Amino acid sequence: MTCTIVVGGQWGDEGKGKIISYLCKKDNPSIIARGGVGPNAGHTVEVDGEKYGIRMVPTGFPNVNAKLAVGAGVLTDPEVLLKEIKMLEKFNVGERMIIDYRCGIIEDVHKETDKSNEHLSKEIGSTGTGCGPANVDRAMRTLKQGKDVESISKYLGDVSEEVNEALESGDNVLIEGTQGSLLSLFYGSYPYVTSKDTNAASFAADVGVGPTKIDEVVAVFKSYPTRVGEGPFPTEMTVEEAESLGVVEYGTVTGRRRRVGYFDHDLAKKVCRLNGATQIAITCLDKYDTDCYGIIEYDKLSEKGKAFIKEVEEKVGVKVTLISTGPELGQTIDVRK
């Protein structure tokens, strides 16, 4: 029995979807539970060459044997959820989905408020998905809960009970974090942050799991960190530099071009300390050095690639156990014992 949390180590878009999908296939958890803010965070999952952009359904959906859960702490947009369940019909998502009956519900008024608020949309760079305004209503105790919405009633359940029962039965459980640690309302570059905390402890609370039940925390870092929206970015490079390195990316939810920077070891160390990270996953090593593309054995990585991994381990103080060298699940180096 292992309970693992996957957390973003930067400003989101670290490639958590790829790492989560890999862990769900390799470790075969019986339940995959999503924590985080809500549908403001997008993940791209590639299965057999086909890409799926999702915002509500857990990223581990390709594992057709696992239950898929959205915790009570996660805001739910019924319209987005139902669209994704339909899009993922061939994965039998609808039969495996559990939405906690206590989750907060995003309505049209929240999305309209988010988009029309000049401070949020222009100064902060909000995604416009209604999460911030919905969390305001939640704090005021006026927000609807899942149990109040008929359209999703067939998917409702008690996620905390499901997860804890799975752990007590000796099953593996994977908790998906969203966005990134540096976007945390508490620990990020306020006010250029999201509307709640985005660290491992909060993700555990989102799905109703106590801290002593957590065995592993995997912090995911991209070789070239990126950021969407406003706010500080200490190692940011120019657009020209990013293009010369072939690093041009766009956000899954907003479609906005991502800002790109160099790896920041000091910030990575702070993030690992904040989350109690037990291991690190590095993604897009093939972007850092194209000679690493598709390599699946550590010893066959280029010297440049190995040096990058070694420097991360030495400066951050946490072992790198997973290395992504391409978009496919098979393009992963796994050095876990």
From Swiss-Prot:
Gene3D superfamilies according to UniProt: Adenylosuccinate Synthetase, subunit A, domain 1 (3.40.440.10), Adenylosuccinate Synthetase, subunit A, domain 3 (3.90.170.10)
GO biological process: 'de novo' AMP biosynthetic process; IMP metabolic process
Binding annotation for Mg(2+): 13, 42
Pathways involved: Purine metabolism; AMP biosynthesis via de novo pathway; AMP from IMP: step 1/2
Any one GO MF annotation of this record: GTP binding
Binding residues for substrate: 252-258
InterPro entries registered for this protein in UniProt: Adenylosuccin_syn_GTP-bd, Adenylosuccinate_synth_dom1, Adenylosuccinate_synth_dom3, Adenylosuccinate_synthetase, P-loop_NTPase
Cofactors that this protein relies on: Mg(2+)
SMART domains registered for this protein in UniProt: Adenylsucc_synt
Entry GO CC: cytoplasm
Recorded family membership: Belongs to the adenylosuccinate synthetase family.
Subunit structure: Homodimer.
Protein name: Adenylosuccinate synthetase
High-level lineage: Archaea, Methanobacteriati, Methanobacteriota, Methanomada group, Methanococci
